[in-house]
Design a protein with these regions (language model features):
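C-terminal output helix
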Residues: 104-117
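Receiver (REC) domain active-site loop signature in two-component systems and cognate sites
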Residues: 55
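Acidic, metal-coordinating helix/loop segments flanking the phosphotransfer/catalytic sites
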Residues: 29-48
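Hydrophobic/aromatic residues positioned on beta-strands within the core alpha/beta folds
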Residues: 79-81
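Short acidic/polar segment at the start of the alpha1 helix of CheY-like receiver
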Residues: 3, 9-13, 106
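Charged docking surfaces used in two-component/phosphorelay signaling
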Residues: 14-22
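Active-site residues of response regulator receiver
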Residues: 52
Length: 118
């Protein structure tokens, strides 16, 4: 199953990619929302999108707004991944499936992704 990870912090991006690939997921990565849309246009949709909010070029809020405008993309569960104090508030505001707070615990990442990639 394919997962799209969108984060401009390459250490976080690489860590999530390694954790997910070790569990057998196929992982695509993007450093901002614009790159994420390019990834989404290239192949079958991922079972879930892990989305950071604070990024250059196109941030997570902008990405999510445009994602929700497209019926097909809006159907992909999106998990907000953020260092903000109340990530659940961001998830609700953005109509996301749920949220994970940074720093990311590997077990929580796998459990959360596993809920949407069955």
């Amino acid at each position: 199953m394919k997962v799209l990870v969108v984060d401009d912090d390459y250490a976080v991006l690489d860590a999530m990619k390694d954790i997910l690939e070790d569990e057998g997921y196929e992982v695509s990565v993007a450093a901002n929302g614009l790159e994420a849309f390019k990834e989404l246009a290239q192949g079958p949709p991922p079972c879930v999108i892990l989305l950071d909010l604070m990024m250059p070029v196109m941030n997570g809020w902008e990405f999510r707004e445009k994602q929700l405008e497209d019926e097909g993309l809006a159907a992909i569960p999106t998990i907000i991944v953020t260092a903000h104090n109340k990530p659940e508030v961001n998830a609700a505001e953005l109509k996301a499936a749920t949220s994970i707070r940074k720093p990311i615990a590997p077990a929580l990442l796998l459990e959360t992704v596993g809920r949407y990639c069955v």
